[in-house]
């Protein structure tokens, strides 16, 4: 936050930041709801990862696409045409098969149980889907960088309170300087930049399309792990990657055939 707020002020400029902050003051109850679902997503995600096998956790996290598509169909009339298309449904199915192959890499899933950890992962996926729905519903006019920073400003005290109540030890854990540097860089790139771009994309792309493209994350993770960490990329993962890319391409084609004008309409009366 010490970096994000100065960045927002510098990039928006004095005049625009004043106008945008007025919008934030009007929308703060809705931003608080968005921050709450962001907090719940992160809380359930971490709790789930500690309780199930990483492969199972990654697969369960991808159930978010099912929640996102279902909720988008119920809430946004302009996304229903996309969801009804056979090519979209085939693309999603192909992408999910690709995700499964990419994540498992042919490894056995024996030993993984549908226990409390699995429930946490599914709740995390549901919280993320609701988080996405509310972003598109409520804050399309707020600059994405300001929206990201405001939501994190609201959510951060919740994380501190949870940490203290859980009795997990010092609020500031002991770690070497290199670890803190790595955490800072990953936070700025992965959270600051990633969330800002996600906020910016939702009003233009819609929840359904943005969630579908999110299925590429396991593939990118496998590729980066191979390039940077030297982790083995198995042939079955490569096949999964091809299926995933093909499925996402089909989804993209459908999205821009059904909504070629770019920015999607906001539902009326919400």
Predicted segments — roles?
Residues 57-63, 134-157, 187-227:
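Helix-helix packing/entry segments at the starts of transmembrane helices
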Residues 2, 46-80, 124, 207-226:
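Specific alpha-helical transmembrane segments that line the substrate/conduction pathway
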Residues 32, 48, 74-80, 138, ...:
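Hydrophobic/aromatic residues within transmembrane alpha-helices
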Residues 68-73, 84-106, 215, 224, ...:
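Hydrophobic transmembrane alpha-helices of multi-pass small-molecule transport proteins
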Residues 18-19, 47-50, 103-116, 164-182, ...:
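Membrane-interface helix termini and inter-helical loops of multi-pass transporters
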Residues 9-61, 101, 187-205:
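Specific transmembrane alpha-helical segments of multi-pass solute transporters/efflux pumps
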Residues 1-11, 67, 87-98, 116-123, ...:
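Hydrophobic alpha-helical transmembrane segments of multi-pass integral membrane proteins
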Residues 10, 78-79, 179-181, 214-270:
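C-terminal-most transmembrane helix of multi-pass membrane proteins
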């Amino acid at each position: 936050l010490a970096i994000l707020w100065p960045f927002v002020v510098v990039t928006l400029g004095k005049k625009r930041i004043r106008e945008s902050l007025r919008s934030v003051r009007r929308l703060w109850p809705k931003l608080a709801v968005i921050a709450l679902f962001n907090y719940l997503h992160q809380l359930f995600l971490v709790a789930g990862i500690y309780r199930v096998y990483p492969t199972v956790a990654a697969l369960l996290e991808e159930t978010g696409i099912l929640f996102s598509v279902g909720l988008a169909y119920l809430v946004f009339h302009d996304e229903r045409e996309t969801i009804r298309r056979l090519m979209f449904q085939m693309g999603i199915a192909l992408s999910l098969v690709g995700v499964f192959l990419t994540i498992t890499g042919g490894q056995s899933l024996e030993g993984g149980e549908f226990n409390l950890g699995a429930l946490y992962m599914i709740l995390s996926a549901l919280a993320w889907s609701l988080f996405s729905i509310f972003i598109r519903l409520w804050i399309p006019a707020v600059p994405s960088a300001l929206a990201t920073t405001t939501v994190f400003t609201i959510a951060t005290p919740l994380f501190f309170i949870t940490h203290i109540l859980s009795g997990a030890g010092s609020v500031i854990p002991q770690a070497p300087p290199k670890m803190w540097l790595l955490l800072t860089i990953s936070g700025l790139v992965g959270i600051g930049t990633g969330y800002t771009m996600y906020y910016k994309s939702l009003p233009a792309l819609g929840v359904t399309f943005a969630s579908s493209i999110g299925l590429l994350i396991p593939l990118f993770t496998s590729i980066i792990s191979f390039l940077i960490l030297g982790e083995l990329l198995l042939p079955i993962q490569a096949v999964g990657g091809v299926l995933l890319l093909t499925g996402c391409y089909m989804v993209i084609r459908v999205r821009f055939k059904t909504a070629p004008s770019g920015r999607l309409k906001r539902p009326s009366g919400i």
